């Protein structure tokens, strides 16, 4: 049910895990079931370029990928100064409030709207501009990483299952 709202007609997937990986192997069945277009990344070094070329709607990866992404984005965010730093901090803070369904004040709603237009939209564009969700699987995703990615406009789901039976049988929102 979590995937229904994000599955469009012929959704675009970008994959970079080895096809022999049990998680990726299972994801292939989903891609076939939803008649998705599948793009294969040339390499991890070219992943961002491939995302901009393929404009994926759904991307699956293991938690280590999202942990690395979290660290790289934080390095960039930590270099920000002045109003840019304030906007980034508000984007994360208010994004987490929205994620955890906490009520925003009128001022916070206005600031969150500004953050959406100036920060989150720019981040989304860096990931191809069409991303509807990341799906993490093959291990537990750190809640801090998942909530951070969601808060900055990169919707992230936590997939889970048993490798022995099937690596992903369901997804939870972070």
Report residues per predicted region.
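Short active-site oxyanion
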Residues: 36-37, 131-134, 154
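Conserved AMP-binding/adenylation subdomain of ANL enzymes
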Residues: 1-12, 19-120
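Extended, domain-scale alpha-helical bundle/helix-rich regions
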Residues: 51, 134-135
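Active-site loops of AMP-binding adenylate-forming
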Residues: 141, 150-154, 162-174
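Active-site glycine-centered loops adjacent to acidic/histidine catalytic or metal-binding residues
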Residues: 18, 138, 161
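Short, surface-exposed connector motifs at secondary-structure boundaries
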Residues: 10-12, 126-132
């Amino acid at each position: 049910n979590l995937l229904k709202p994000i599955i469009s007609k012929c959704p675009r997937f970008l994959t970079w895990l080895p096809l022999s990986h049990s998680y990726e192997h299972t994801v292939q069945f989903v891609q076939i079931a939803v008649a998705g277009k599948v793009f294969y990344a040339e390499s991890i070094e070219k992943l961002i370029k491939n995302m901009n070329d393929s404009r994926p709607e759904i991307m699956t990866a293991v938690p280590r990928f999202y942990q690395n992404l979290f660290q790289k984005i934080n390095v960039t965010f930590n270099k920000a100064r002045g109003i840019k730093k304030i906007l980034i901090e508000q984007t994360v803070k208010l994004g987490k409030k929205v994620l955890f369904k906490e009520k925003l004040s009128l001022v916070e709603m206005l600031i969150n709207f500004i953050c959406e237009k100036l920060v989150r939209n720019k981040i989304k564009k860096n990931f191809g501009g069409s991303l509807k969700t990341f799906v993490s699987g093959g291990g537990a995703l750190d809640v801090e990483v998942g909530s951070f990615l969601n808060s900055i406009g990169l919707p992230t789901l936590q997939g889970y299952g048993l490798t022995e039976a099937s690596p992903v049988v369901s997804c939870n929102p972070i």
